[in-house]
Design a protein with these regions (language model features):
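Well-ordered alpha-helical segments embedded in enzymatic catalytic cores
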Residues: 87, 111-118, 168
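Short small-residue beta-strand/loop micro-motif enriched in glycine and branched aliphatics
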Residues: 97-102, 155-157
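Conserved beta-strand elements of beta-rich interaction domains across eukaryotes
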Residues: 73, 95-97, 135-137, 159-162
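Short beta->alpha junction loops
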Residues: 103-108, 159
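Short catalytic-loop micro-motif centered on adjacent basic/acidic residues
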Residues: 102, 129-133
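Short, well-ordered alpha-helical microsegments
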Residues: 113, 139-141
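RNase H-like DDE catalytic core and adjacent DNA/metal-binding regions
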Residues: 1-96, 105, 121-128, 140, ...
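Domain-scale segment recognizer with a strong primary affinity
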Residues: 3-9, 21, 33, 46, ...
Length: 236
Protein backbone atom coordinates (compact mmCIF):
# COMPACT_ATOMS: atom_id res chain seq x y z
CA UNK A 1 0.00 0.00 0.00
CA UNK A 2 2.81 2.43 0.90
CA UNK A 3 4.53 1.87 -2.43
CA UNK A 4 1.26 2.29 -4.34
CA UNK A 5 0.44 5.60 -2.62
CA UNK A 6 3.94 6.99 -3.15
CA UNK A 7 3.80 5.98 -6.82
CA UNK A 8 0.43 7.66 -7.29
CA UNK A 9 1.72 10.76 -5.48
CA UNK A 10 4.24 11.48 -8.25
CA UNK A 11 1.98 10.72 -11.24
CA UNK A 12 0.24 13.28 -13.43
CA UNK A 13 -2.85 13.53 -11.23
CA UNK A 14 -4.48 16.73 -9.91
CA UNK A 15 -3.45 15.69 -6.40
CA UNK A 16 0.15 14.82 -7.39
CA UNK A 17 2.95 16.59 -5.51
CA UNK A 18 0.40 18.35 -3.29
CA UNK A 19 -0.50 18.21 0.39
CA UNK A 20 -1.78 15.06 2.08
CA UNK A 21 -5.36 16.32 2.16
CA UNK A 22 -5.48 16.17 -1.66
CA UNK A 23 -4.99 12.41 -1.71
CA UNK A 24 -7.25 11.58 1.26
CA UNK A 25 -10.21 11.09 -1.11
CA UNK A 26 -8.38 8.31 -2.93
CA UNK A 27 -7.01 6.46 0.11
CA UNK A 28 -7.66 6.13 3.82
CA UNK A 29 -6.15 8.95 5.87
CA UNK A 30 -4.05 6.67 8.07
CA UNK A 31 -2.58 4.91 5.00
CA UNK A 32 -1.69 8.24 3.36
CA UNK A 33 -0.06 9.59 6.54
CA UNK A 34 2.00 6.43 6.94
CA UNK A 35 3.10 6.27 3.30
CA UNK A 36 4.07 9.92 2.86
CA UNK A 37 6.17 9.86 6.03
CA UNK A 38 8.54 7.70 3.99
CA UNK A 39 8.49 10.00 0.96
CA UNK A 40 11.58 12.21 0.73
CA UNK A 41 9.87 14.35 -1.93
CA UNK A 42 6.89 15.07 0.32
CA UNK A 43 8.91 15.57 3.52
CA UNK A 44 11.58 17.84 2.04
CA UNK A 45 9.11 20.22 0.39
CA UNK A 46 6.33 20.05 2.96
CA UNK A 47 4.62 23.41 3.27
CA UNK A 48 4.59 25.02 6.69
CA UNK A 49 1.56 27.27 6.81
CA UNK A 50 1.62 30.52 8.73
CA UNK A 51 -1.30 32.81 9.36
CA UNK A 52 -1.27 35.69 6.89
CA UNK A 53 -3.60 38.61 6.38
CA UNK A 54 -4.12 40.21 2.99
CA UNK A 55 -6.35 43.01 1.85
CA UNK A 56 -9.21 41.36 -0.07
CA UNK A 57 -9.25 41.75 -3.85
CA UNK A 58 -12.76 42.13 -5.21
CA UNK A 59 -13.22 40.77 -8.74
CA UNK A 60 -16.58 39.89 -10.25
CA UNK A 61 -15.87 38.46 -13.69
CA UNK A 62 -13.35 36.73 -15.91
CA UNK A 63 -10.62 38.92 -17.44
CA UNK A 64 -11.34 41.75 -15.02
CA UNK A 65 -7.90 41.63 -13.37
CA UNK A 66 -4.59 39.97 -14.22
CA UNK A 67 -1.53 39.88 -11.97
CA UNK A 68 1.95 39.31 -13.41
CA UNK A 69 5.39 38.62 -11.97
CA UNK A 70 8.80 37.15 -12.79
CA UNK A 71 10.29 34.14 -10.98
CA UNK A 72 14.09 33.84 -10.84
CA UNK A 73 16.08 30.62 -11.38
CA UNK A 74 19.48 32.27 -11.52
CA UNK A 75 21.80 29.99 -9.55
CA UNK A 76 24.72 28.82 -11.77
CA UNK A 77 23.78 25.12 -11.71
CA UNK A 78 20.19 25.90 -12.77
CA UNK A 79 21.27 28.24 -15.57
CA UNK A 80 23.74 25.69 -16.94
CA UNK A 81 21.27 22.78 -16.78
CA UNK A 82 18.51 24.77 -18.50
CA UNK A 83 20.52 26.05 -21.47
CA UNK A 84 20.50 29.66 -20.33
CA UNK A 85 16.87 29.90 -19.21
CA UNK A 86 16.91 31.91 -15.98
CA UNK A 87 13.42 33.36 -15.54
CA UNK A 88 9.78 32.36 -15.57
CA UNK A 89 7.19 34.97 -16.52
CA UNK A 90 3.91 34.22 -14.74
CA UNK A 91 0.43 35.70 -15.12
CA UNK A 92 -2.85 34.77 -13.43
CA UNK A 93 -6.50 35.72 -13.87
CA UNK A 94 -7.44 36.66 -10.30
CA UNK A 95 -11.07 35.59 -10.82
CA UNK A 96 -10.71 32.11 -12.38
CA UNK A 97 -7.13 31.37 -11.18
CA UNK A 98 -6.24 30.50 -14.79
CA UNK A 99 -2.50 30.96 -15.19
CA UNK A 100 0.14 31.19 -17.92
CA UNK A 101 3.88 30.61 -17.57
CA UNK A 102 6.76 31.30 -19.97
CA UNK A 103 10.44 30.36 -19.44
CA UNK A 104 12.77 33.21 -20.49
CA UNK A 105 16.51 33.59 -21.01
CA UNK A 106 16.34 37.25 -20.02
CA UNK A 107 13.79 39.49 -18.36
CA UNK A 108 14.10 42.44 -20.70
CA UNK A 109 11.05 44.52 -21.50
CA UNK A 110 10.77 43.21 -25.08
CA UNK A 111 10.87 39.57 -23.94
CA UNK A 112 8.20 40.09 -21.28
CA UNK A 113 6.01 41.99 -23.72
CA UNK A 114 6.25 39.14 -26.25
CA UNK A 115 5.12 36.69 -23.55
CA UNK A 116 2.20 38.91 -22.55
CA UNK A 117 1.13 39.31 -26.19
CA UNK A 118 1.06 35.52 -26.52
CA UNK A 119 -1.11 35.30 -23.39
CA UNK A 120 -3.64 37.68 -24.96
CA UNK A 121 -3.70 35.58 -28.14
CA UNK A 122 -4.08 32.36 -26.16
CA UNK A 123 -6.92 33.45 -23.89
CA UNK A 124 -8.71 35.42 -26.63
CA UNK A 125 -9.62 38.34 -24.34
CA UNK A 126 -7.83 41.35 -22.94
CA UNK A 127 -7.91 42.02 -19.21
CA UNK A 128 -9.42 45.26 -18.04
CA UNK A 129 -6.61 45.78 -15.53
CA UNK A 130 -3.11 44.48 -14.88
CA UNK A 131 -1.51 44.55 -11.44
CA UNK A 132 2.21 43.99 -10.84
CA UNK A 133 5.11 45.00 -8.63
CA UNK A 134 7.69 47.58 -9.68
CA UNK A 135 9.97 45.20 -11.57
CA UNK A 136 11.82 47.07 -14.32
CA UNK A 137 10.63 44.62 -16.98
CA UNK A 138 7.01 45.58 -16.22
CA UNK A 139 7.34 49.35 -15.88
CA UNK A 140 9.35 50.10 -19.02
CA UNK A 141 8.04 52.61 -21.54
CA UNK A 142 7.57 50.08 -24.35
CA UNK A 143 5.35 47.83 -22.25
CA UNK A 144 3.43 50.81 -20.86
CA UNK A 145 2.70 52.01 -24.40
CA UNK A 146 1.53 48.53 -25.43
CA UNK A 147 -0.89 48.35 -22.49
CA UNK A 148 -2.19 51.85 -23.15
CA UNK A 149 -2.79 51.07 -26.84
CA UNK A 150 -4.80 47.99 -25.79
CA UNK A 151 -6.73 49.96 -23.14
CA UNK A 152 -5.40 47.84 -20.28
CA UNK A 153 -5.06 49.84 -17.08
CA UNK A 154 -1.78 48.99 -15.34
CA UNK A 155 -1.31 49.79 -11.68
CA UNK A 156 1.57 48.93 -9.35
CA UNK A 157 1.66 47.48 -5.85
CA UNK A 158 3.97 49.27 -3.44
CA UNK A 159 3.30 47.30 -0.25
CA UNK A 160 5.60 44.56 1.04
CA UNK A 161 2.93 41.97 0.24
CA UNK A 162 2.91 43.10 -3.39
CA UNK A 163 0.43 41.04 -5.47
CA UNK A 164 -0.77 38.19 -3.23
CA UNK A 165 -2.57 36.07 -5.84
CA UNK A 166 0.33 35.78 -8.27
CA UNK A 167 2.80 35.46 -5.38
CA UNK A 168 0.79 32.52 -4.03
CA UNK A 169 0.70 30.93 -7.50
CA UNK A 170 4.46 31.36 -7.84
CA UNK A 171 5.05 29.50 -4.56
CA UNK A 172 2.72 26.68 -5.62
CA UNK A 173 4.28 26.34 -9.06
CA UNK A 174 7.87 26.51 -7.81
CA UNK A 175 7.09 23.81 -5.26
CA UNK A 176 5.72 21.57 -8.03
CA UNK A 177 8.83 22.12 -10.15
CA UNK A 178 11.26 21.44 -7.30
CA UNK A 179 9.44 18.25 -6.32
CA UNK A 180 9.68 17.01 -9.91
CA UNK A 181 13.36 17.96 -10.04
CA UNK A 182 13.91 15.97 -6.85
CA UNK A 183 11.98 12.99 -8.24
CA UNK A 184 14.16 12.85 -11.37
CA UNK A 185 17.37 14.05 -9.69
CA UNK A 186 17.66 16.83 -12.26
CA UNK A 187 18.24 20.59 -12.29
CA UNK A 188 16.46 20.97 -15.64
CA UNK A 189 13.27 22.66 -14.41
CA UNK A 190 12.24 23.71 -17.94
CA UNK A 191 11.41 20.12 -18.91
CA UNK A 192 8.82 19.94 -16.12
CA UNK A 193 6.96 23.21 -16.81
CA UNK A 194 4.24 21.69 -19.01
CA UNK A 195 3.68 18.76 -16.63
CA UNK A 196 3.45 21.04 -13.58
CA UNK A 197 1.09 23.37 -15.43
CA UNK A 198 -1.21 20.47 -16.36
CA UNK A 199 -1.40 19.41 -12.71
CA UNK A 200 -2.13 22.97 -11.53
CA UNK A 201 -4.85 23.66 -14.12
CA UNK A 202 -6.71 20.45 -13.28
CA UNK A 203 -6.33 20.76 -9.51
CA UNK A 204 -9.27 21.97 -7.41
CA UNK A 205 -8.62 25.44 -6.03
CA UNK A 206 -9.63 26.05 -2.43
CA UNK A 207 -11.10 29.52 -3.03
CA UNK A 208 -13.29 28.79 -6.07
CA UNK A 209 -14.06 25.11 -5.23
CA UNK A 210 -13.12 23.92 -8.73
CA UNK A 211 -10.14 23.74 -11.05
CA UNK A 212 -9.04 26.78 -13.11
CA UNK A 213 -10.03 24.97 -16.32
CA UNK A 214 -13.55 24.46 -14.96
CA UNK A 215 -13.69 28.08 -13.76
CA UNK A 216 -12.89 29.29 -17.28
CA UNK A 217 -16.21 27.94 -18.59
CA UNK A 218 -18.81 30.70 -18.99
CA UNK A 219 -21.56 28.68 -17.31
CA UNK A 220 -19.47 28.44 -14.12
CA UNK A 221 -18.88 32.19 -13.74
CA UNK A 222 -21.78 32.75 -11.26
CA UNK A 223 -20.56 29.84 -9.13
CA UNK A 224 -16.99 31.16 -9.09
CA UNK A 225 -18.23 34.63 -8.14
CA UNK A 226 -20.32 33.25 -5.28
CA UNK A 227 -17.46 31.19 -3.84
CA UNK A 228 -14.93 34.02 -4.23
CA UNK A 229 -17.08 36.60 -2.47
CA UNK A 230 -18.01 34.14 0.25
CA UNK A 231 -14.33 33.49 0.89
CA UNK A 232 -13.63 37.24 1.13
CA UNK A 233 -16.40 37.63 3.69
CA UNK A 234 -14.72 34.96 5.85
CA UNK A 235 -11.49 36.97 5.81
CA UNK A 236 -13.06 40.23 6.89
Amino acid sequence: MDEEINTRYVENKPYSFGGKYRIYKAYAKKDVDKALQKSDIYSRFKQHRRAKSFSPIYVYRKRELFQSDTVFFTTPELVEANHGYKYLFTTIDVFTKMAWVYPMKDNKCKTVMTCFQDILRTCGDKPERLNSDRGSELVCKQFATFLKDNKIHHYLSYSLRKCPVIERFNLTFQRLLYKMMKQHNSYEWTQFVDRAMNIYLNRRHRTIKMSPLEAEKDENEPIVRRHSLRNIEKLR
